[in-house]
Amino acid sequence: MTSAEIRQKFIDFFKSKGHVHVPSSSLVPHNDPTLLFTNAGMNQFKDTFLGLEKREYTRAVTAQKCVRAGGKHNDLDEVGFTARHHTFFEMLGNFSFGDYFKEDALAYAWEFITSPEWLGLPKDRLWVSIYKDDEQAFDVWHNKVGVPADRIVRLGEKDNFWRMGDTGPCGPCSEIFWDMGPEYACDHPDGCRIDTCGCDRWREFWNNVFMQYNQTPEGLVPLERTGVDTGLGLERMATIMQGVWSNWDIDLWQPIFARIHELSGKKYEGEGPEAVAFRVIADHARCCTFLIADGVRFSNEGRGYVMRRILRRAVRFGRVLGFAEPFIWKVAGAVADVMGDAYPEVRERLPVIQDELRREEERFLRTLEQGMNRLEEILARMRQKGETVISGQDAFVLYDTYGFPLDIVRDVAREQGFTVDEQGYQAAMAEQRARARAARDVSYITEVQSRIAGHLEGVAPTRFVGYTELAGEGRVLAVFDQEGNATGAGEGSSVIIVLDRTPFYAEGGGQVGDTGQIVAPGLRVEVEDCRKLPSGHHLHYGTVQEGFLEVGQQVEARVDARKRKDTQKNHTATHLLHKALREVLGTHVQQAGSLVAPDRLRFDFTHTGPMTPEQIAAVEEMINAEIEAAEPVTWTEMPLDEARALGAMALFGEKYGEIVRVVSVGDGWSRELCGGCHVSNTSEVQYFKILSESGIGGGVRRIEAVTGPGVIRHLEEAQARAVEAQEQLRSRMKEMEKELEQLRAKLAASQTDSLVERAQEVGGVKVVAGTAPVATMEDLRNMTDAIRAKLGSGVVVLGAVTSEGKVNLVAAVTKDLAGRVHAGNLIREVARICGGGGGGRPDMATAGGKNPERLGEALNAVPGLVGSQLGL
């Protein structure tokens, strides 16, 4: 049976059981920051299991694309060396959202794998495991499905309690195993069993997870609705159905192996270094093909970096097969041929996929040879010294200089009998990150800038053109590392670049430095910040993403236009805020500091005491009126004395030159000395909203605010918080209601015993009459029944006052008193005293009353009324 047939049969089977076929979701999780990649079939249903999303169906079946590489679920190092590890794989799954649970889920699984109509596996080669305390699962497997008890294995939390990650839906699970046969048994001293050795004789292929909880940072929280999440690995199932030992021997891999054979001239024979290379290349080519199809691109962070590690590992293994030129992009064509019917996006996007792969291969091959030579030198030196562990520092240099991920160093070391000091590597990496962080500290920057300034003596300052341009040509005057040493820089290097001209605004006047790119043919640098030396040289802090950077290169500097525009809105809004505060609070208000960023603004000002809500509203109203008036924003340069004569506000303590830049709003409504970037008209700010006003000490207040799209984000976040608070309140109310019911039940139970103990005897008949702490007629009947049962023989009359101020009454008579005491007649007389009426059967009757103040009198009359019916 082919893999495609297994996939289709699975979908068809569960569709016959009322499941809706839901297409595979993207490998890039939607709106889930807890996941790097989609790594299980249930990822796309996470919000459904949590009760945050409601779907039109309660049963679903999927064939889901998954990747496990990076993060908690990371199989990368094992791929190629074991029979069943892959980075990309397919997970077949059936799901229940508050519909069926364990009994149906396990019965469906057994039917699919054993029925001749579907897979038809022999039952005597199947075993199951359950969570050690899951008696319900044992009962279903043994008593309902018919699995012998000695084939049901109990395992602990590590094996049979499933969690998607550190947070999210989870619960106990039950796995199904295939016995490869006694000829594959190991020699474990306690015997070869699932619960002793877990060796490759036992092939787990289907996991049934019973979603009962949500794992939060605080602990397990029961889900409102239980659910079922199952995962059947397609590759493992195909291994069983096709009668082969290894996942690599199934039909999905053979066309890909054939393509590698065609390109390399080598043959896949299952064992040895070349076989490992075949498997690594095939797996990693398939994984990268699907990731690129789903929009992931190679980069130095996040998903893109993990994909880069995967591809570079494959390229390195390509050397084992003799590849010296890009080749994985050609293997991707075979992947599309094999997988394109099930996943058409791979075939449709193949040109883009191959182009991305080819360019990334070319980029890495430029440094691979040098890096491998350096690694061989390290290994040769170690052999001479009799050492077996590659130092963490050496491994880090291979990464930092040649772009070798730790995976590659580890693989080469393993092949030649060496290991890697991974702790030392991580320490070197942490040290570099600490240096990068320190490079942002003022004290460190002063030292670094001093060193850089020494190198730049006699070099003309950078010409800033960013007021009118967001992109422009420039020449590289100098390149420094994070410690201020002059250098050239290759891919992955953190650098500080000085250009002869730039559109990048350097941090100053509260405005953050621009971000963007510096590019040239074969070169791309991501600029993360821009600062300025007192000498006027702009320092562009960034990371080389592609190519090699050196002095003298002609480059194009490109500012991130969206971020700059948002920053300009916030900077103009800061000027409007300053003016409005002086209008509303008084001219004593002076700017004491500010932060102008793309997503927000912060303004510190002198003022004693908090602003009132009315003052905050007045400031907002004044600013938004200026925005709506669409006033022009202009700037001009003039002598400092002239600017002061015009009334331009200056920042206290700031140093200004003889010629200053004055930014004006409208016809001088606001006029400030400012070297920052602004919109050309107040209407571009769109809207202004104050988020908070607080004191930061010493008679200085702080306002935080947003403009334009930031206001929309703020409102959306506020709405989300309100919804969340509403949900939490609703949940808490439900909990309180439940707690109240429990308290009432406890009180009722206690009252029951007390009333029975205080029963009176009338003519030899036990009589109980009293009030009950219950809210409803149903609760009152239940309590009456409980007392009647405890009495064994007798009469019970209970009363309770409702929340509406009405009286509920119940009378009950034991069967042995039938014909002597009539409950309906008795309750009618009792109710009459309370201003009501009622009646009912001889053994049980209910009534109501309007006068709760007479309930005690009515209950006191019960013994006499019972005596009357007994003829006493």
Curated annotation (Swiss-Prot):
Pfam families, sorted: DHHA1, tRNA-synt_2c, tRNA_SAD
GO BP term (any one): negative regulation of DNA-templated transcription
InterPro entries: aa-tRNA-synth_II/BPL/LPL, Ala-tRNA-lgiase_IIc, Ala-tRNA-ligase_IIc_anticod-bd, Ala-tRNA-synth_IIc_core, Ala-tRNA-synth_IIc_N, Ala-tRNA_ligase, Ala_tRNA_ligase_euk/bac, DHHA1_dom
Keyword tRNA-binding: yes
Cell compartments where the protein resides: Cytoplasm
Cofactor dependence: Zn(2+)
GO CC annotations on file: cytosol
Cofactor binding description: Binds 1 zinc ion per subunit.
GO molecular function, one term: alanine-tRNA ligase activity
Annotated signal sequence range: none
This enzyme's EC code(s): 6.1.1.7
Enzyme class: ligase
Ranges annotated as spanning the membrane: none
Domain note: Consists of three domains; the N-terminal catalytic domain, the editing domain and the C-terminal C-Ala domain. The editing domain removes incorrectly charged amino acids, while the C-Ala domain, along with tRNA(Ala), serves as a bridge to cooperatively bring together the editing and aminoacylation centers thus stimulating deacylation of misacylated tRNAs.
Similarity field: Belongs to the class-II aminoacyl-tRNA synthetase family.
Protein name from the UniProt record: Alanine--tRNA ligase
Organism: Symbiobacterium thermophilum (strain DSM 24528 / JCM 14929 / IAM 14863 / T)
